[in-house]
Amino acid sequence: MAAPTYTWEYVTNLYGLGAPVITTLEATSGLYTKIGTLLVMSSGQVDEATASVVLPVGLAAETISVAATAADPVKVMLLRPGDVIKGTADADASSYSGFSGKLFDFNTDGSLDVADTSGGCASIWRTEDSGLTVFIVLTIFATS
């Protein structure tokens, strides 16, 4: 499976913390990433976030263009409470900006799933580009 179409970029931390730590974790077999791929933990190893992910761990800090084998090292930017990441929504999300109380999850292509407001993990802080560029804060993590 190829790396996702859409990736995320660290922007800031709302609590004034510095940039997140980048650490090396183990990859799952077959993992492909781009820098900024949203990642989750799966049986103690890092895997690409797919549809309906609600427990992310961080963002890929390196590109893996040849399928990883199980336990290959992969650099991951570990996300924390208050970290803002910027990415793409699959529809206009502007009506949800300003921490609307709705939580969203993600699509298989890596974009934010604006139509799904049940059981998600991402709250929208603000939007740009007619609501298609979103700045989100994750509310729960695999490390929580």
What are these regions (language model features)?
Residues 1-144:
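Surface-exposed, low-hydrophobicity beta-strand/loop segments enriched in small/polar/acidic residues
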